[in-house]
């Protein structure tokens, strides 16, 4: 046998083997169409791919699995006239999808059933929310902890024991513990943290312990002198400022005029704060004015960093009575206009890169903790509730609470949705609705949750996935090829 004959025989053998290669489709997939493109998300594989309509045809034919010939045959049985060379078009596409890890040449492992394992919620504590005081000079209509703060203040005035705010010395002890536990950032919050006496001394102490200090403030109490101190002590400052329109601000955050916080932000900018950001809570009331905010903030405040946060109801009743929750489609289309306007002024925003795994990427009890003004420890600043109480720093060190608290351990080991439809959804891995706050608020009104909240979170997931498109874009064939829809 000649060398050419042997070579040809080897090639034929490889070709025959390739022809018998079986392609497997992921067990769980979410798809979203936009114009002539289709996005596919495989959560178990943590993969996103984008194809055109012809690619969608091939993937539909591949759902049952099979060889390239079998998949091409399913295509040819479709309701369209297909040109020749189907095999030549299909096989390279399938191979590319394997390369992208969307398809596989080996059977996928059985779909993960039930709940994520506790290991997925391992402790990597990095952020501590430290509530310096329950006092606040504003009366925001949507405040998530107003009732608790008001109750705590009333109990202190009545002389109730154990409810007093932590002293400066006790806060220093907390900061000592935080440093020992490797916590890198402490967020000074409240109430309004600038109402706390000696806040600057406490921030300075945190820096001495090697901890980065951040400030979350409503901005109404900042004059030029305070702005300079803040710039010296805090690495990050976030100012809650919902609107540049007086009437909107007054309705959402009564208690101080808009110009007061406007001046505060300007003072911070002039003082040279290292990282200064505006956080508007976006509601149905101020949504329409949001796209104009970046240019106005740059011109008048020299601030172009924004952390927009959508208003989320604190109870089912609030969802029905306040009417502040925005329409999902209107919200996301307006947010797109906002980001475009932000780009035009060279602004920046909180990174919304899509984390493709991690049960919604909630950091409660794992990467963050929260301590109330009276020393109670909770898994999250939005979960200061009795059922999630982990201990008190007056009775135990922070390290002891982290190690011994049944509440924190249970929270970390039970990071799965309480709502059955959520656990069956292909978007669960990236969906914000798996946050325990929402599951807790709507536990007894799941009907309302799935009617009004679920569509919003679904649209959010799609928004985040599509923002990944430029990184993972995969165009199958141009519109003139035999497999296109024409």
List the predicted regions and their residue ranges.
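Acidic, low-complexity/disordered tracts enriched in E/D and polar residues
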Residues: 1-61, 482-486
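Radical SAM enzyme [4Fe-4S]-AdoMet core and its adjacent flexible, acidic
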Residues: 2-3, 8-14, 233-236, 240-377, ...
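Flexible mid-to-C-terminal extensions adjoining Fe-S/redox cofactors in radical SAM and related proteins
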Residues: 3-8, 384-486
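Short capping segments at the starts of secondary-structure elements
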Residues: 60-70
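DNA-recognition alpha helix
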Residues: 70-80
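Conserved alpha-helical substructure of the radical SAM core
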Residues: 81-84, 88-96, 100-104, 109-229, ...
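Cys/His-rich metal-chelating microdomains
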Residues: 135, 139, 143-146, 365, ...
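Conserved, mostly hydrophobic/aromatic
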Residues: 136, 140, 375, 398
């Amino acid at each position: 046998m000649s060398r050419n004959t042997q070579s040809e025989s080897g090639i034929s053998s490889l070709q025959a083997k390739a022809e018998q290669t079986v392609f497997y489709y992921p067990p769980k997939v979410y798809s979203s169409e936009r114009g002539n493109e289709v996005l596919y998300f495989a959560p178990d594989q943590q993969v996103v791919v984008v194809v055109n309509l012809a690619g969608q045809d091939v993937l539909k034919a591949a759902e049952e699995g099979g060889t390239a010939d079998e998949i091409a045959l399913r295509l040819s049985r479709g309701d369209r006239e297909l040109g020749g060379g189907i095999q030549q078009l299909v096989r390279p596409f399938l191979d590319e999808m394997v390369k992208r890890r969307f398809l596989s040449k080996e059977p996928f492992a059985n779909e993960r059933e039930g709940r994520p394992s506790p290991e997925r919620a391992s402790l990597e504590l990095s952020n501590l929310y430290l509530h310096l005081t329950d006092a606040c000079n504003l009366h925001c209509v949507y405040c998530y902890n107003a009732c608790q703060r008001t109750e705590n203040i009333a109990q202190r005035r009545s002389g109730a024991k154990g409810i007093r705010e932590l002293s400066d010395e006790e806060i220093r002890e907390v900061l000592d513990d935080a440093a020992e536990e490797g916590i890198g950032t402490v967020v000074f919050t409240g109430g309004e943290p600038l109402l706390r006496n000696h806040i600057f001394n406490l921030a300075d102490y945190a820096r001495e312990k090697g901890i980065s200090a951040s400030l979350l403030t409503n901005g109404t109490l900042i004059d030029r002198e305070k702005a300079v101190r803040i710039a010296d002590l805090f690495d990050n400052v976030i100012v809650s400022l919902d609107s540049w329109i007086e009437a909107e601000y007054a309705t959402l955050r009564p208690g101080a005029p808009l110009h007061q916080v406007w001046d505060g932000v300007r003072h911070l900018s002039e003082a040279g704060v290292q990282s200064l950001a505006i956080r508007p809570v976006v509601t149905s009331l101020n949504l329409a004015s949001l796209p104009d905010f970046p240019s106005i903030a740059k011109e008048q405040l020299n601030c172009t960093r924004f952390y927009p946060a959508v208003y989320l109801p604190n109870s089912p009743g609030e969802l029905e009575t306040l009417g502040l929750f925005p329409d999902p489609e209107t919200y996301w289309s307006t947010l797109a206009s906002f980001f475009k306007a932000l780009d035009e002024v060279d602004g920046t925003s909180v990174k919304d890169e899509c984390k493709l795994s991690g049960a919604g990427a909630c950091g409660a009890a794992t990467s963050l903790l929260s301590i109330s003004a009276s020393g109670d420890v909770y898994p999250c600043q939005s979960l200061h509730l009795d059922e999630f109480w982990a201990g008190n720093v007056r009775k135990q060190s922070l390290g002891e609470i982290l190690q011994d608290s049944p509440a924190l351990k249970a929270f970390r080991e039970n990071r799965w949705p309480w709502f059955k439809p959520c656990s069956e959804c292909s978007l669960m891995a990236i969906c914000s609705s798996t946050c325990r706050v929402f599951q807790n608020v709507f536990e007894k009104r799941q009907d309302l949750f799935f009617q009004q909240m679920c569509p919003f979170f679904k649209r959010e997931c799609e928004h985040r996935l599509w923002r990944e498109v430029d990184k993972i874009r995969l165009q199958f064939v141009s519109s003139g090829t035999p497999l296109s829809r024409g």
